């Protein structure tokens, strides 16, 4: 379980102080897929960086399985982070390492014996559908394949939590659907708690059990995904839903090919949990 209590994060000093997060309070249950939804500049990235202490909060607590990680000293951070995997929009792979050696990298840092780390990496590559890609390099992979390598690497230390920071923003709609399907599979089969940071209503709608809407560094709305989207209470969420409807109307398919593409792109976890990730 993740409990965030009265979290504040400010940048700068004195008159130049900018409060990025104001009194954030959240409880994320173990095994949940929890979405943090917001527009650019809303505070999403600041929150996720505080959650794994890439940045320390100005005040407040982040309690994971009963332990307040904000009290951990810098020299002990590496141990805390082994329990928190993270993937990013830009994949962040090592271009000079093979796919296999990208996945083994966190295990190398933990001094895991070579045989065990390669066994773990090969298992994870099979899990994400890349068992035949171990000796390739990132430059030889598509964007979706690179993100799957990043997912495998994030799982290397068998974390109980994975933070996904705009993990599908650089991908097309079809590949996004495939990656969301994979993340849902990981959540179900490995019982990994997923925290999905996104600006996309479609992503939140299709994978998240619950969603917190963040705006101006504050949680303005929180609840079950379907209920929240059916009956939004905040101005920002109502505006985003209205904008989405308008955009969908403008992009309405005009032929069978477009309809087929739309159906494929919306074949996300809640609609197609059993589909194989290509």
Which residues fall in each region the model found?
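ABC family nucleotide-binding domain
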Residues: 2-4, 8-208, 212-216, 220, ...
């Amino acid at each position: 379980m993740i409990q965030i209590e009265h979290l504040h994060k400010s940048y700068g000093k004195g008159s130049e102080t900018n409060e990025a997060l104001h009194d954030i309070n959240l409880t994320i249950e173990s095994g949940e897929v929890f979405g943090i939804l917001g527009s650019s500049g809303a505070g999403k990235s600041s929150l996720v960086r505080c959650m794994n202490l890439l940045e320390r909060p100005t005040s407040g607590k982040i309690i994971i399985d009963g332990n307040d990680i904000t009290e951990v000293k810098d020299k002990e951070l590496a141990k805390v982070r082994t329990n928190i995997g993270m993937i990013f929009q830009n994949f962040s792979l090592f271009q000079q390492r093979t796919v296999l050696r990208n996945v083994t990298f966190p295990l190398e840092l933990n001094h895991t014996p070579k045989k065990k780390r390669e066994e773990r990496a090969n298992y994870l590559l099979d899990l994400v559908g890349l068992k035949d890609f171990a000796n390739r390099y990132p430059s030889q992979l598509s964007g979706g394949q690179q993100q799957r390598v990043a997912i495998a690497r994030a799982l290397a230390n068998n974390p109980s939590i994975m933070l996904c920071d705009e993990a599908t923003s650089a991908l097309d709609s079809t590949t996004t659907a495939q990656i969301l399907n994979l993340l849902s599979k990981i959540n179900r089969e490995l019982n990994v708690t997923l925290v999905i940071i996104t600006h996309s209503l479609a992503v939140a709608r299709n994978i998240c059990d619950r969603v917190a809407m963040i705006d101006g560094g504050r949680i303005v709305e929180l609840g079950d995904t379907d209920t929240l989207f059916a009956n939004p209470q905040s101005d920002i969420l109502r505006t985003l839903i209205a904008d989405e409807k308008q955009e969908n109307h403008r992009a309405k398919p005009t032929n069978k090919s477009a309809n087929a593409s739309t159906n494929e792109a919306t074949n996300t976890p809640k609609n197609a949990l059993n589909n194989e990730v290509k």
